[in-house]
Amino acid sequence: MAGGSDGSENLDNQDFAQNRRAQYRHTMSNHLEQLTAEWLEYRGYFVRQSVLVGKRDTGGFAGELDIVALNPTTRHLVHIECSLDTDPWSKREARFTAKFERGRTYVPSLFAGLDLPAKVDQVALLQFGGGTRETLGGGRLIWVPDFVADMLSVLRKSRPDKAAIPSTLPLLRTLQLAAHFSQPRGRTGCIIEQPEGATIA
């Protein structure tokens, strides 16, 4: 419904813009979750993603865990929550504390019957922010740039022509190509030709 002259149109536009930003953050967060899940699978983990936990008798669930993964060889059990938020630290602390408390309650039941460690390693994976903080909500804090750098340092050791990442891990396979072929090899490789001195819009 169109807004009126009383300013409701501006409010409608603001709501629309806020919804679009929220949808964008959700989509990008899902992308980060998928990349993280692919990395863990590549490194030998059993991975569960977007896991609903705490089913209520009245319907619904207590919440959702982004990624839970277990390495059967090392017995490393990890719960990762990904976020692209730009919230103040106080709000982040409260939110991740609740997420990780939920994880400690429900993660062990996701791998019932398996030999699990006594403690769940919990990680907050954030893209935006900075400082010297190393923990959040009771879990370890890892920044996306550091996470990507770690992946690239490993992927540079496996050549695409000799040890290609499986096509079932498309995001990680793209990173492997970028790790080995990031330097331009001449204009013959340009799909879209750019005039000399031109900048990409």
Protein language model regions, located:
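Intrinsically disordered, low-complexity Ser/Thr/Pro/Gly-rich regulatory segments
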Residues: 6-201
